[in-house]
């Protein structure tokens, strides 16, 4: 409840809509409340006295009241919906903006599936609760209180029936609502698991098909889906239990009304119209209590969602720009790692252990090692995708923590292992690297990445539309566009994290040549699993089990580093450097 209350400040800009909507609802409620009384007069006066003119006059009054009620209902729906939708839109906007500031560790702590559920289902649940609050939470109590007052004034003889029926209805609704509210939190948690499994399958569909694991994945999805179904059924059963109980109580009230009211009619102390009006008001009370209970159900469902939204909004982002941050006009690109250690789990299981090295401005440095040796992790420390646990990472002699974060990252071109392109044109993807890049700059970057040839062959060239995940490009094409996107910003530091693994040997050689000539002032880190990709680097760093075990040129490492020798032999053992070219 506290979390939901904290979100109410998002409603402030839309208070006009939030106030005017319920005011329209007051009009609708007033019209609903007078209709049973009008019907009572039609029966007791018009029909009893056979006064057709009176019946027509009161009938027209009923139609007018219904029309006014319709206007009130439509006005309430329009303004309340505007308030609730804008309220939810602003929350969603802030949640998304907060997620965008998350470090990799922050995102890992939530998981992609949970974040997707929060941004979609949870905020939608909060929106529904707000809509029902503005529309129904005003209508329900007004109908309830108004009906009781009218019955007390016009049919006091039948009022004791309400004193019995209403408390029973309230107790039944409160009991069922309290039981159901705890189930909704479990529903959201189960939905998280379904979303996570679905997201994994959609992103890994090629692997699943390649290994013929569709049946296994269907079974796994079936398990989490069945769990969600069971919890949903439990929640629905509790809510469904409400209607039969309420109808039973109300039916008992109607029977009591007909019994007691019938005797009063025979005695001449009550008229038939009053009994029918009382039954109508009893039904209005029933509907008002049901609507109030549904609002509280929805609010109870929104409380866990609000908790999860607040969990995102209140998350302390662990990688931010520090006070008095350094923002030089240009970062030169000298890199120093000083006794750097890092652990993903923060339990002293370090994936990088006491790493120290230095790279001069403009050097081309290869980084190699077996799978899991820490190559990619090391590269992610430079743009502060993660922060070190021990030691320092310095650029131009300044700790990366001291830099303005945007300035630091704008000076680094990062090409990850998996080429990630966004839906849209190739040009839009290239401009992701530099929004104000000229067409000439785009073409130079594409040419350096050996992407020009295939781009020009596409139907719309640079305007060629990429599908989600760029599935309409090959792996090598995606990697080349990804490299071009990094090059277009002319970075001080370029990180290629095994970014040419799907590129043919000739294109890879041309890319390496372009890096040596067109970007010779750029400090370049070439992370690779193949020696052939880094053999011409100014120096090579060798990682093994998170430790730096080699630092030197290809020839020096062949003589001095046992791990490098093993990698060299495993890849043919006949590579040599001659005239800047690689031979086998």
Feature map (PLM): residue ranges:
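Alpha-helical transmembrane segments
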Residues: 28, 32-36, 64, 69-84, ...
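Membrane-integrated ABC transporters
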Residues: 1-34, 39, 47-61, 72, ...
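An intracellular "coupling" helix at the cytosolic face of ABC transporter transmembrane type-1 domains
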Residues: 13, 80, 101-105, 121-130, ...
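Short intracellular "coupling" helices and adjacent cytoplasmic loop segments at the cytosolic face
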Residues: 49-50, 85, 93-117, 121-123, ...
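Transmembrane helices of ABC transporter permease
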Residues: 13, 17-30, 62, 69-71, ...
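ABC-type nucleotide-binding domain
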Residues: 328-584
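Helix-loop-helix
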Residues: 51, 55-57, 150-164, 234-308, ...
């Amino acid at each position: 409840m506290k979390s939901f209350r904290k979100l109410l400040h998002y409603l402030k800009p839309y208070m006009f809509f939030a106030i005017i909507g319920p005011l329209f609802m007051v009009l609708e409620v007033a019209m609903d409340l007078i209709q049973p009384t009008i019907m009572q007069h039609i029966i007791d006066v018009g029909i009893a006295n056979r006064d057709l003119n009176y019946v027509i006059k009161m009938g027209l009054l009923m139609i007018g009241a219904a029309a006014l009620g319709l206007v009130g209902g439509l006005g309430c729906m329009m303004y309340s919906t505007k308030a609730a939708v804008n309220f939810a839109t602003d929350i969603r906007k802030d949640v998304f903006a907060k997620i965008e500031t998350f470090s990799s560790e922050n995102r890992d702590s939530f998981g992609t599936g949970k974040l997707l559920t929060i941004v979609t289902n949870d905020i939608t649940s909060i929106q529904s609760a707000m809509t029902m609050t503005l529309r129904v939470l005003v209508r329900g109590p007004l109908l309830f209180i108004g009906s009781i007052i009218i019955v007390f004034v016009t049919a006091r003889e039948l009022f004791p029936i309400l004193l019995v029926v209403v408390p029973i209805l309230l107790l039944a609704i409160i009991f069922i609502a309290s039981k159901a509210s705890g189930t909704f939190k479990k529903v959201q948690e189960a939905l998280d698991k379904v979303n996570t499994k679905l997201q994994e399958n959609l992103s890994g569909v090629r692997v699943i098909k390649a290994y013929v694991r569709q049946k296994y994945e269907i079974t796994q999805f079936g398990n989490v889906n069945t769990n969600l179904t069971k919890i949903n059924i439990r929640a629905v059963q509790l809510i469904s239990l409400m209607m039969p109980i309420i109808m039973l109580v109300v039916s008992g009230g109607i029977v009591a009304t007909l019994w007691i009211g019938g005797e009063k009619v025979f005695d001449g102390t009550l008229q038939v119209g009053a009994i029918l009006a009382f039954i109508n008001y009893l039904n209005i009370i029933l509907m008002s209590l049901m609507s109030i209970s549904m609002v509280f159900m929805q609010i109870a469902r929104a409380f866990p969602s609000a908790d999860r939204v607040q969990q995102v909004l209140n998350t302390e982002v662990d990688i931010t720009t520090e006070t008095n941050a350094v923002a030089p006009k240009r970062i030169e690109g000298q890199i120093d790692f000083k006794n750097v250690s890092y652990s993903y789990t923060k339990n002293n299981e370090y994936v990088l252990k006491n790493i120290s090295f230095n790279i001069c401005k403009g050097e081309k440095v290869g980084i190699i090692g077996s799978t899991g040796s820490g190559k990619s992790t090391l590269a992610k420390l430079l743009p502060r995708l993660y922060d070190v646990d021990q030691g320092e990472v310095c650029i131009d002699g300044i700790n990366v923590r001291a830099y303005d974060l945007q300035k630091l990252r704008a000076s680094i071109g990062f090409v990850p292992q998996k080429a990630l392109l966004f839906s849209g044109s190739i040009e839009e993807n290239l401009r992701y690297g530099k929004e104000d890049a000229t067409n000439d700059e785009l073409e130079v970057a594409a040419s350096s990445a050996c992407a020009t040839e295939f781009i020009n062959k596409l139907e719309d060239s640079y305007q060629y539309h990429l599908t989600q995940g760029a599935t309409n490009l090959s792996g090598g094409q995606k990697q080349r566009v990804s490299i071009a996107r990094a090059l277009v910003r002319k970075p001080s530091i370029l990180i290629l994290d095994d970014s040419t693994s799907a590129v043919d040997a000739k294109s890879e050689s041309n890319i390496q040549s372009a890096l040596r000539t067109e970007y010779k002032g750029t400090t370049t880190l070439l992370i690779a699993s193949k020696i052939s990709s880094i053999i011409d680097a100014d120096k090579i760093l060798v990682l093994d089990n998170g430790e730096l075990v080699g630092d030197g040129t290809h020839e020096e490492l062949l003589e001095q580093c046992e791990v490098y020798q093993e990698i060299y032999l495993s890849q043919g053992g006949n590579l040599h450097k001659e005239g800047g070219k690689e031979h086998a």
